[in-house]
Design a protein with these regions (language model features):
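Acidic, low-complexity, intrinsically disordered interaction modules
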Residues: 10-65
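Short, charge/polar-rich alpha-helical segments
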Residues: 1-9
């Protein structure tokens, strides 16, 4: 995994919990971010097939890992 991919994964992970402002000026980082983000959303849709709303998927995901971050 390249350094830029690691950065993108960290941003995706942190963004779910901290709602970070993403700096899109780095096109390569932006491309990796969205690639990982859409892969992640597909994973959530598979994990919670009964939930189709993106906000509800993210909420379920955050609640699963809230205790892990505390």
């Amino acid at each position: 995994m390249t350094n830029i991919e690691k950065q993108a994964r960290k941003i995706v992970r942190d963004a779910y919990f901290d709602y970070l402002e993403i700096d899109y000026s780095n096109r390569e980082l932006k491309d990796h971010f969205f690639k990982i983000y859409y892969h992640h959303m597909q994973f959530l849709e598979d994990l919670f097939p009964e939930t189709t709303d993106e906000d509800k998927l993210e909420s379920k995901w955050r609640s699963m890992f809230k205790k892990e971050r505390e």
